[in-house]
Every structure is written in structure tokens, then in C-alpha cells.
């Protein structure tokens, strides 16, 4: 069982175990040992978002990697998908991202990409942990010319802008569109506005003044109300909101209504079916996706395959089945024809291309899917346990499932990145499912000593 790595790398409060400089250095040493193979000079890319603690962790990781005789390529603040892309395009041995994605600035994280730009498999992360905790590489200390060097890649952002624009159809541009763009004071604060402006859009940018502590603070994809208000104030055609590391995106239409990841996947997947380019007419989503997505895909002649929550599991299923589109309700979308991981700006470009090609507003395109009412309630628990072993909880859940009569569902799962139990209900009557979700959350909190949060 993994001790350090969760569903999206190592994550926690910066400067508190395991997110300390000492552990970052150990992780760097273990990674360098694993990716070092043969006599040639090896290179690992390090990128980050705009958190204050990024400087500390970047320096520690760099020291650990160089101390094992591996060179480091520093790209500075860059979206997570940009780090994956540059790792692959520069033929580096691995890429490291220092980010806690949509979490507040106090948190930070470390996650890896392999040389092909995909996230590491569980086995490699387990190997890294074994090297750290067994201390068996502590005595390995290259000296003299064998010590690694660090280089700064000054044009990393420009390279990624060029790549992103290359994914947009050559016969289209964004002229005539007014876009509100919220970069969450995060990693895409320079890249995203440049991409949309260079393609011809009028861009109203918010969340583009990072100061180390304002990443995701009342802005970005977790706060679409900010972008929604700006769209209405400026009479914009739509709003695009990224999270701190720009691997996810949420939209609002011209009326300020939120268009989430499920609807975006429905728009893109049905368009790809029409063009004959959706492989096996199959979309890969997670168990959190609304049943309305399944209905929309079936109507278009496609199907949805569901995985566990986490974009890494979506990508694994896509690679295993040979599919080219997948994503999550939260706004992670993977277009494998273009990139290897969730990419907020790239996903936005694909939606904008559909709007421009068909000369339709986002509100029109969003009608392709009608979501079933869905309610999510979180319970903060001190530790994870099997709630179905508590008779009162199990009975209530079974009773609710019986009431839904196959026209909805109950999904209960632990978060992979936070100490939360997520209780999600779908059904035709929002009042009923909200009441039942709160009932389940209350009894879980009562029996297991937690705190319910609607």
C-alpha cells in the first residue's frame, strides 16, 4: 500500500510532512535513481504553479535530483499539461509538477510524468516509496563531474503557446468572440491569454496577477460565479475558467450559466461522432459523471465507459481500450489525439472550434445534454473506514436505493486528495435526492464522528 502517493501524486500542507523540503529532496533522489538508465546524461524537467512554497520545493527537488547525477531543466510557472508536453518534446527522462491543482495556496504537491508525457503507474510510485523509506540509496553520492547540473528553459511558455495554437483548426480563428478568461492566479496566467488573443479573440482576463498566496482564492474553476458576473457585465460570448495548474476548465455561456465537464464532454464527443473521429464512438468518463451524459451519447450513437474517479484512471482506460476522448465532470478533459493529460486551455480551444465552425452559441451547444438532478454532500472524517459495515448507515443507503427504483443512483466514495467522504445522489426529483443525501451525511457524521458539509 502506498504511503506517500495519492491519486494525484504527493500532496499536503507545504512545510508539513510529507510536503517538506527534506521529503522533496528524498523524492528527487528516488526519482533520479529510477529514471537513470545507462551511461548517458539524464534530464528531468521541473515545473510549478504560482504558490509561494513552490520556490522551496523546487530548490529541494532540484538538489535531490542533481545529487544523484541527473540534470534538471527548470521551466518555472507552467500549466501541468505544458510540463507533460515539454517533457515529451524535449525527450527528457521524466517531468515533475509542483502543484496542488485547485487546492488553496497553503497546500502543495509533487507529481510525475514519464518521458512520454503520461502520469506514472502505481508500480513506479511504489518503487519510489520503497527507495525513500528503505534508505538503500542514501549512500549513493556521485562526485566531481558526475554531479547533475540545472538549466533554465527560458522559452517554455512560448513553446507551449505555439503547441496549443497548433491544436486549433487552421481554417478557423476566434475573431468576433469576446471571452472572459479566469486563470485562477495560477500557472496559465500568461499562456492562456496569449493563446486566445493570438487566435483573434477579444479577451477580458481575470485572475492573472498571482502573488504567491492568491492562487484559486475566490477565482478559477471552483468559483465560476466570478466569471459568470463578468460575462454579464461585459456582454461576453462566454467565460472560460481554469484551476491553479490549468489541467481543468469550466465554462459559462453568454447568460452566465455554468457549463460543466459533463456537458463539455457531450458537446465534444457528439461532434467527434459526427466527424467520424471519435474512436469506437466511445467516451471514457468517471462514475461521478451524470447519467444524462450516457443518455446524450446513446442518442448520438455512442457509448460511455465509466472508471474510478481520477484523470489517471480515465487515461489508463483510454490507453487500454484505444479511445481518444475522456474526462471528468470537474472539467478535466483528455484529448489523446493532442495531449497526454487533462488540459484546460486545449479543451477550451476544442469547444471554441465547434462554436466557430457551426456559428452557434455555447448555450445552444449545451442543449445536447440534459443532466439529471445531482446532489453532492461531503462529510469530513478523521479516518477512512468501510461505512457499509455500520448497520444503520447500510440500511439507510439500501432504503434510498430502493426509493430511486433504478431511475437514479447513490454513489459514495472517499476523496483521493482530501479527508472527505463524498455522498452523491442522482434522480428525477431534486428535492427528494437532496433530502436523502443530507440524511445519509447526517447518520455518517453521527456514527463516525465527522462533520457534514453541503
From Swiss-Prot:
Mg(2+) binds at residues 101, 243, 245, 247. It is an enzyme of class 5 (isomerase). It catalyses: alpha-D-glucosamine 1-phosphate = D-glucosamine 6-phosphate. InterPro entries: A-D-PHexomutase_a/b/a-I, A-D-PHexomutase_a/b/a-I/II/III, A-D-PHexomutase_a/b/a-II, A-D-PHexomutase_a/b/a-III, A-D-PHexomutase_C, A-D-PHexomutase_C_sf, A-D-PHexomutase_CS, Alpha-D-phosphohexomutase_SF. Gene3D superfamilies: Alpha-D-Glucose-1,6-Bisphosphate, subunit A, domain 3, Alpha-D-phosphohexomutase, C-terminal domain. GO terms for cellular component: cytosol. Binds 1 Mg(2+) ion per subunit. It holds the Pfam family PGM_PMM_II. Its cofactor is Mg(2+). The active site is at residue 101. Coiled coil: none annotated. It comes from the Bacteria. The modification Phosphoserine is found at residue 101. One of its GO terms (molecular function) is phosphomannomutase activity. Its EC number is 5.4.2.10. The keyword Transit peptide does not apply. GO terms for biological process: carbohydrate metabolic process; peptidoglycan biosynthetic process; UDP-N-acetylglucosamine biosynthetic process. SUPFAM superfamilies: Phosphoglucomutase, C-terminal domain, Phosphoglucomutase, first 3 domains. Keywords: Isomerase, Magnesium, Metal-binding, Phosphoprotein. PANTHER family: PHOSPHOGLUCOMUTASE (ALPHA-D-GLUCOSE-1,6-BISPHOSPHATE-DEPENDENT), PHOSPHOHEXOSE MUTASE. Belongs to the phosphohexose mutase family. NCBIfam families: glmM, PRK10887.1. HAMAP family: GlmM_B (MF_01554_B). This is Phosphoglucosamine mutase.
